[in-house]
Amino acid sequence: ARIKSTVNSNKLYNGSDKMSYLNVEFPGGLRVDARLKNNVIKTDQPVTAGGEGGAPSPFELFLGSIATCAGIYALSFCNGKGISTEGMSISMDIEKNMQTGLISKINMDLKLPEGFPEKYRKAIVNSMELCTVKKHLQTPPQFDITTTTAK
């Protein structure tokens, strides 16, 4: 079985206007891997959920994607201003809605490097708010899931 996620592209894939963006494979156990360009994104379920815990779960990668996206904006801001990023880090914690089990709030704390100019505190937060992953949560895409038979 193979799940294929597609996005619109100017390139043709199998005679259509859609191109495969990534392919998902099932290497065994509860592991699920995504092949994206020249990279493999490995996932597994925690031991408590029957997996081996050998890689982050898809949901952990989702949260990591949000934080690293904010991080690249913070990094780019500092690089653009010539500000050292030594000692800079982001920590994230989440608040869950106990009725739904879904996240109700994501909190990120940017630890600024020593000597970070006070006048740029708000600006670096504003740059992190531009994160594309976050924007997709605010305006979610339509999901279209289909099936085909493997040959």
Predicted regions and their residues:
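Extended beta-strand/beta-hairpin segments
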Residues: L12-G64, I72-K151
